[in-house]
A protein has these predicted regions:
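Carbohydrate transferase catalytic cores enriched for Leloir-type hexosyltransferases
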Residues: 1-153
Length: 153
């Protein structure tokens, strides 16, 4: 990725004490000036990071719902996500979906989003449309409709 887009920087947000990072020697990456481990950030910082990012990569194996991908989309950030658990249903066609272990596929998708502005803008547009499905009014109506179906049965 650094060869194809040398100006690209990667910010890892969140705790690095999880088992996902257990077998990694993070000190090797901390020397790399293009990779920054930010740890937990405030909501204000998170919005700023999403808003200024080329893309948000979310390689999750297990995800209950996927709020981070919706947060990124709400900030106008294209999403590259796993094709596992609830994420395909939450994202539909508004994101690029990859196997969570397909690092090359994610890197290729990132290069595409950086180099092809029209495609990037299309994913931003689709992201805004997708997020609108999850506003409070729509969510309440969906729950109400489901409860009515159960009451009738």
């Amino acid at each position: 990725l650094s060869e194809r887009v040398p100006e690209l920087k990667m910010y890892v947000i969140g705790e690095t004490k999880s088992r996902s990072f257990n077998d990694m020697d993070l000190s090797l990456y901390k020397k790399e000036s293009r990779i920054k481990f930010l740890g937990r950030v405030s909501d204000v910082q998170l919005v700023k990071l999403y808003s200024n990012a080329c893309a948000f990569i979310f390689p999750s194996f297990y995800e209950g719902f996927g709020i981070p991908v919706l947060e990124a989309q709400a900030c106008g950030c294209p999403v590259i996500s796993s094709n596992t658990s609830s994420l395909p249903e939450v994202l539909l066609d508004s994101a690029i979906l990859c196997e969570p272990t397909d690092i090359q596929g994610m890197a290729k998708s990132m290069v595409t989003l950086v180099k092809e502005e029209n495609m990037r803008n299309e994913y931003i547009r689709k992201g805004f449309i997708n997020v609108a499905r999850f506003d409070w009014e729509s969510s309440c109506k969906m729950i109400s409709d489901k409860l009515k179906c159960f009451a009738i049965s």
